[in-house]
Amino acid sequence: MVEQLLLPLWNNLATVDDETLPLMSTALLIARDEYPDLDANLYDTLVQSYVEYLRSEVEEISLWPLKMAAVNRYLFQKLGYSGNHDEYYDPRNSYLNQVFERRLGNPISLAVIQIEVARRLGIPLDGVSFPGHFLVRLPVDDGILVMDPFNGGRPLDAEELRERARPHLGGEAPDDRALAQILNPAPHRTILVRILRNLHSVYANTDRWDRAARCADRILKLVPNQPEALRDRGLAYLQLGHRSGALNDLKRYLQLYPSTHNVDMVRGHLVDLSNERIQTH
């Protein structure tokens, strides 16, 4: 009997430890919101077929970087997985089932596949929630090897990493200590929240507020009372005409984050919503 891949339940995720939160199956759970007929076992079987194809080659290699090079050659050259440079903000780039089907994705979705294949082969690959584009990292004897899944798993040296980080740090390149902190392994929860934030951004920027609200709500299933997700869901509810939901979320946001830079905007919405409630009573 073939073991079935069981997707987790949204309402249980907040209490799951970061170390045991399943990465690929929760990423597929995110995709199932948009593709309700998604067959998770199909993609689990697909990943396992990649693993079985690679197993003998990888087991004959002793060094982690060379093992990972074999994985990258297979995924990015033989199978043709690649970054979607032409339509970077296509939401399909964030839905893992679509990345498997089209072999096109964004940095974080490609990283999830890389990590899943590597881990099943015993390779300790981690994600890096790098500013701008998501990366992956592998321990080596003298430190870590950082790779770019959006560009075929290409290795990145310290100088290129500093230059990539610079625009996101006020124009300052990080020193060695700051760079090491940026390159810390990303917990699975952080990776999943970043997938959802990417999707929320795409949907909010294209006025698809029902989906934007859904993405913010899913973040709150992973991280209850996460301030930015409360704000984002509240603003999406406002656009959808769900006034009571907007009022509750935006109030809670200001309670948790009273010094936010957008306090005036949020307070303005709260005043308008409160006035509407008074007028309807």
UniProtKB/Swiss-Prot annotation:
Claim: Repeat is one of the keywords in the record: yes
InterPro entries: SirB1_N (IPR032698), TPR-like_helical_dom_sf (IPR011990), TPR_rpt (IPR019734)
Gene3D superfamilies to which the protein is assigned, alphabetical: Tetratricopeptide repeat domain (1.25.40.10)
Keyword tags: Repeat, TPR repeat
Ranges annotated as spanning the membrane: none
One Pfam family here: TPR_9
TPR repeats: 193-226, 227-260
PANTHER family: F-BOX ONLY PROTEIN 21, SI:DKEY-261L7.2
Family: Belongs to the UPF0162 family.
Protein name per the record: UPF0162 protein PD_0709
Organism of this sequence: Xylella fastidiosa (strain Temecula1 / ATCC 700964)
